[in-house]
Design a protein with these regions (language model features):
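A structural signal for hydrophobic secondary-structure junctions
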Residues: 10-160
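Structural beta->alpha junctions
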Residues: 2-9, 134-136, 167-176
Length: 184
């Protein structure tokens, strides 16, 4: 139980496509969205490929690219985008404005994620930075990177897997009674 609270990706949900199909069938009053939460080191190379700066990163792979996704709306990314644009491909990243300032990251730079895969293997993955954001949540987005879930799955060897699956009412209005009933 304690390990599962830390959301390590070696305890990820597998076969999420089928899980989501089942959830949609059993709970049609909700829509479902997978997420991968992960952390590691972000390395920013200079023009020679040598480390210019690096620091810890808390990253989230969310569904930014599929046609029916509402994550851009839920995260209010159109309103919270400071520089650049939203990702258009699975390997593009948004970096929090605070992290960009701390690591001297500019839109157009490549950020190399260094971490571990779902199978605890070492991984590095290059993410072009296409934009910066500010969620206006204080420390919550201090070290944050957002990428499409398909890019996170590729970088972390998590094909058809996720850390968690979130359910939302179609109106995006939170109803505590419905949430408690669903949990029970």
């Amino acid at each position: 139980k304690e390990e599962s609270q830390m959301l390590p990706n070696d305890l990820a949900l597998l076969d999420i496509d089928q899980i989501i199909v089942d959830l949609e069938k059993n709970y049609p009053e909700f829509f479902w969205s997978p997420r991968i939460s992960f952390g590691g080191l972000l390395d920013i190379p200079d023009s020679n490929g040598e480390t210019k700066d690096q620091g810890p990163v808390v990253a989230m792979g969310i569904d930014l690219l599929s046609n029916n996704s509402r994550m851009i709306e839920i995260w209010k990314l159109n309103n919270n985008l400071i520089l650049g644009r939203l990702p258009q491909t699975s390997n593009e990243a948004l970096i929090s404005q605070k992290l960009a300032s701390k690591l001297n990251i500019s839109v157009g730079d490549t950020a190399t994620f260094i971490g571990t895969t779902m199978h605890n293997a070492f991984t590095t993955y290059n993410f072009p930075v296409v934009g910066t954001f500010d969620l206006r949540k204080g420390q919550a987005d201090k070290q944050m990177m957002l990428i499409d879930i398909s890019g996170a799955q590729l970088a972390l060897d998590m094909e058809n897997a996720a850390s968690e699956i979130f359910g939302f009412t179609h109106s995006l209005f939170y109803d505590d009674d419905k949430a408690v009933n669903l949990r029970n």
